[in-house]
Amino acid sequence: MSPKAREFDEEAELCLGDFEMGVTLGLGSFGRVRLARYRRTGKHYAIKMMNKAAVLQMKQLEHIRSEKNILVQIAYPFVVNMFGTFQDETTIYMVFEFVCGGEFFTLLRNEDKLPNDQARFYATEIALTLSFLHNLKIVYRDLKPENLLIDKDGHLKITDFGFAKEVEDRTWTLCGTPDYIAPEIIRNKGHNKGADWWAFGVLLFEMLAGYPPFYDESGGFGTYKKILKGMVEYPEDIQAEAVDLMSKLLVADLTKRFGNLHKGAGDIMDHPFFDTVDWNMARRKEIVVPMIPDIEGENDTSYFEEYDDEDEHVEQVCTPPLPRAYTALQPADPRAFAPRRSQRRIRKSSATSESMVLFSTNSRLGMPRWRLEMCVAAIIGGNLSLLSIYITADGRPGPARPETRMLFN
């Protein structure tokens, strides 16, 4: 682990007045990320702004503390750097490096699916990062395209460590993203680094196929059932080595899942799918990148969605509004509403309850006039009970739909 770089005067206390705030780069569950220029040096950063009232209301303070404590102590080529934090009466601020190539999510959306060599390149950098974190006893727990950024040189950087946690053995916190969630999390049997390698297998499948392996048109229940059954249909055009690797990652039995065995990440790195990879060169960023963003300057935001810097109440809502590309009632391309177009999370609602709150954005779940705004879920025995709350594309309240189904015995 390399020493953490210092960006600001150690003696100086940062405040909002030190920065000239720019455009919004993204919206989150209780805040937004904005481009900002540090007045003393003119350098640009990404500042995550979180409304304190919303953070407390959603019981996310511990997640924020955990993210800060983890990021302040690590430095790695494929992890976004956090350079400082500060706060005022209403808001918590976290200062990150500005990664100007945009989200990996956007690349997948535009390319639909990736050639084997390109997918292998990105999978290499992700595998190195997960291995690095696991060696520090850190489980990431939220791997998905939306949490991967592309830097100016075309390399990946993992961001958003809100669900990351230092784990010695297992943890039982209910968290993750439905399409990427491991079966042991759904069953609430405790999970460890193996959950990250499951998500890695899901992401590799999505890169190569253009959709997640457990996608179900019916929404969450169908996805969870497919995950628990563990049945994956691989497209015929995916090479055999990739299929073999994914079949060893998407294994429900933790004692047989690659990445969670005696050799750890070594089983993955030694797999034939990665035969052409020099891992030391990859770690030093010496492998030729498949795509370099066309960046005009360090403050270029052209690879990010455009957001209106509207009323401040937007920063306090539970979920962000639909991006422009997804607000049409009748989409030109139905694939725009596949699960990988969404930003969905499961959050534990309290320290003692087994209930979860699932936030789903950018997703219509086959309902052209409604999108899922929030879903409160509770696991009791083998039953998963959901109360789904929908809103219209223009933000008006929609129907509430209670459902209870048996997921497992």
Q: What is the meaning of each model-derived region?
A:
Residues 84-85:
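A short, aromatic-enriched beta-strand patch in the conserved N-lobe beta-sheet
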Residues 242, 283-409:
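Eukaryotic Ser/Thr kinase distal regulatory-tail detector
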